[in-house]
Amino acid sequence: MSNVLLSPNGYVFASPKPLGRFINSKSGGRKLFFSVVRASSDDADCNAEECAPEKEVGTVSMEWLAGEKTKVVGTFPPRKPRGWTGYVEKDTAGQTNVYSIEPAVYVAESAISSGTAGSSADGAENTAAIVAGIALIAVAAASSILLQVGKDAPTRPKAVDYSGPSLSYYINKFKPSEIVQPSTPSVTEAPPVAELETSLPETPSVAQQETSLPETMASEAQPEASSVPTTSSTS
């Protein structure tokens, strides 16, 4: 069996004899033949500086969009032969990493779409035609509604001339008669203050009664005094 040394870019095949015998042997007459086979490097898998994407770090590349001449219909993310897609990022060691996060592009097969992947302006003609058709239908519907409303509009009634009496005649006719009440004379009553003032001059009569009391008492005392001497004389 032969010993095999693996390298990142190729394979190294030693001589048919074991490698240990070559190291331990002291004879210098033997010759060793080494054959180096380098593996083919794919451009899409290389990580060298010349193959690194020339993209701005921290942004998402937009090369996953459909090309102008793409003829594939449906969900298909077209890409160029050496296109770099995804999120470009550099790590702390300075190595550029590309993450494949591109979304799938869907080409709708409808009347608005052009039916093929490409720029968004390809289906603008169909979109404009559909919008114009919808606008014409809306205008026709609005005009028909206005015509129907104009036909069904009610006619205005004709004015009739009035030949009867005026309104003031009926107002005076049905106006109720006014009720006249006779005026009653107002009775004036003397205020009580005047009665008090008229009763004040009568108060001197009380003083006259008081002055008459001593006179009556004196007149009563005189007959008693006159009666006493008469009794003594008779005795």
Swiss-Prot record:
The chain crosses the membrane at residues 127-147. It comes from the Eukaryota. Residues 200-214, 224-235 have a biased composition (Polar residues). Disruption phenotype: Altered photosystem II (PSII) function under high-irradiance light. Elevated photodamage to PSII reaction center proteins after high-light treatment. It is a single-pass membrane protein. InterPro entries: MPH1. One of its GO terms (cellular component) is plasma membrane. Residues 181-235 are annotated as: Disordered. Interacts with photosystem II (PSII) core complexes and participates in the maintenance of normal PSII activity under photoinhibitory stress. May protect against photodamage or stabilize PSII under high-light stress. Participates in the maintainance of proper PSII function under high-light stress by protecting PSII from photooxidative damage. Interacts with psbA, psbB, psbC and psbD. This is Protein MAINTENANCE OF PSII UNDER HIGH LIGHT 1. It comes from Arabidopsis thaliana. The lineage of its organism: Eukaryota, Viridiplantae, Streptophyta, Embryophyta, Tracheophyta.
